[in-house]
Structure formats: C-alpha cells, structure tokens
C-alpha cells in the first residue's frame, strides 16, 4: 500500500484527492480524511506509478507528483502552500470583513481594526495585524484589489464587538434593531445603522451592541454631535484635547477641539 498525509504547515487538509496512475494500469484513488491521511491499496509490485495529490477547494497551490515503484508499503506525504486571497476595497476606503481562515495584514497596505468599545455614538477602533479565523474586522485601505495571505492561526481577540458573517449572510430582524448594526455610507459619512430587513453580506461583519442612538459613527470626529463654546464650564483644559485630525493639542491651541466625544470652539 501507499499511505501518507497532506498538510498545510501543521494543518491537516481534508478532502484532498490522492491518485496513483500508471501506464496500462487501473487508477487507484482516495480522499484524505479529517486528519489529512490517505491510504491506497491494491498497488501492484514492480510497477511504475505516478502519485498525485489535488486540492479541490482551489485554496492551495499544486504540488509536484511523486514516483512510486515498490513492492513494500510506502509512505508519501504532501506539503501544500496556500494561495493569497484578493480583498477588494471600494472608493469609500472602508470594508467590514471576515474570512474562514486567519489572515496576516502585516506588510500589506491594508489596516485591520476591531471594535472593543462604543463611546456614545461612535466606535473606538483597535488595530490588529493578525486576524483570527471568522473574526469580524473593519478594513481600511486605498480603493484597489489587495493581496492578503492566510496563516494557520492567530491569537484570539477578546472583547471584539464586530461579528463576522463567514458562513452566511446575516439579516437584522425587528427584534435585533438597536442591537445589531450594519456599516454603510450615508451623506458621505461611514456609520453603523440598525434597520430591520438590512442584510449583511457573507464574509462581512456587523456591530453587536445595544444602544438607543439612531446611528453609531465609525470615527470619533464624525460622531461628535454637541458643539459648544469654552467658558461654559464644560471644557476641561487640564485634560487631553484633540484637533479634528485626532492630534493632541495644548492649552494655547485655538480652534475646534475634541474632548470626551464632544466638540468645542476654543
């Protein structure tokens, strides 16, 4: 018999078709199991066979065939490498996203963010480079097709409020209004909205957060709704203040500043 295992790194690959073929000989084939293992029996002694392994998912690069010519049990293993995926970012520069395998965004032009906190009516984004399988993220990049390489594993992300839709699309039902939010562009601003009947596409993500706000903005600057002036006791110049670009400013700064999710004319 001929036996072995098909792997991607340390990950066993199920469903790989392994075949023995020889001139004038009947093909012998098997499919790898959940542990990536296969076994071919009925191999004729002293015959020349070519052993091939084919990934039917299209996720992995083809591997070289191997020659088999033996009258004893022979172990033949296959090491597959994965093909990078293409991630399309439209002109908004923003994309809610999830994928069935872990992804590594380091070294790419794409930045990946999770949401660990909602501050009133805007999200606070945390950048991560390695995204676990199935994890919902917000991607930011220039409009283009970006190549990203799947990896075997990535550390779990605790407290992420984004839910990935890897297996199927998600519909916001009436009972989920105010609890599930889809990201869309409205009046030129990226914002999460919670409307019954809204469909979130497969391989996307939605925000799972209970709120009575009408919208939840993606960015702090967009989420500021209260404009007031200094001198009314609300602005505390001893605490951090930021300009509209998100840069910390000092007490001498003049203009619009942001503090604790509010905008002030200073």
Residue ranges and their predicted role:
Residues 1, 73-83:
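Conserved "repeat-terminator" motif of extracellular CCP/Sushi domains
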Residues 2-14:
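Structural motif
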Residues 23-39:
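Short, acidic Ser/Thr/Gly-rich low-complexity loop/linker segments typical of extracellular
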Residues 45-57:
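A short, solvent-exposed beta-strand micro-motif common in secreted/extracellular proteins
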Residues 55-76:
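Structured interaction patches on ligand/partner-binding surfaces of diverse proteins
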Residues 82-106, 129-224:
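A short, polar beta-strand/turn micro-motif
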Residues 222-266:
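C-terminal outer-membrane/trafficking sorting elements
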């Amino acid at each position: 018999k001929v036996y072995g295992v098909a792997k991607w790194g340390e990950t066993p690959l199920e469903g790989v078709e392994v075949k023995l073929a020889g001139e004038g000989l009947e093909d012998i084939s098997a499919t790898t199991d959940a542990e990536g293992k296969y076994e071919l029996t009925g191999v004729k002694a002293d015959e020349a066979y070519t052993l091939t392994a084919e990934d039917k998912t299209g996720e992995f690069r083809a591997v070289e065939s191997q020659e088999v010519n033996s009258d004893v049990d022979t172990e033949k293993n296959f090491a597959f490498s994965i093909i990078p995926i293409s991630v399309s970012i439209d002109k908004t520069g923003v994309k809610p996203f999830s994928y069935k395998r872990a992804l590594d965004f380091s070294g790419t032009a794409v930045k990946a963010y999770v949401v660990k906190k909602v501050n009133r009516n805007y999200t606070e984004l945390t950048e991560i480079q390695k995204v676990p399988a199935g994890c919902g993220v917000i991607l930011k990049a220039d409009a283009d097709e970006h190549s990203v390489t799947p990896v075997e594993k990535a550390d779990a992300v605790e407290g992420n409020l984004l839910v990935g839709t890897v297996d199927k699309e998600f519909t916001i039902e009436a009972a989920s209004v105010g609890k599930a939010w889809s990201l869309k562009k409205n009046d030129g601003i990226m914002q999460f909205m919670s409307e019954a009947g809204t469909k979130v596409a497969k391989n996307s993500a939605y925000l799972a957060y209970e709120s009575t706000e009408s919208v939840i903005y993606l960015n702090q600057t967009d989420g500021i709704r209260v404009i007031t002036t200094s001198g009314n006791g609300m602005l505390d110049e001893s605490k951090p203040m930021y300009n509209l670009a998100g840069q910390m400013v000092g007490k001498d700064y003049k203009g619009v500043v942001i503090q604790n999710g509010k905008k002030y004319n200073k």
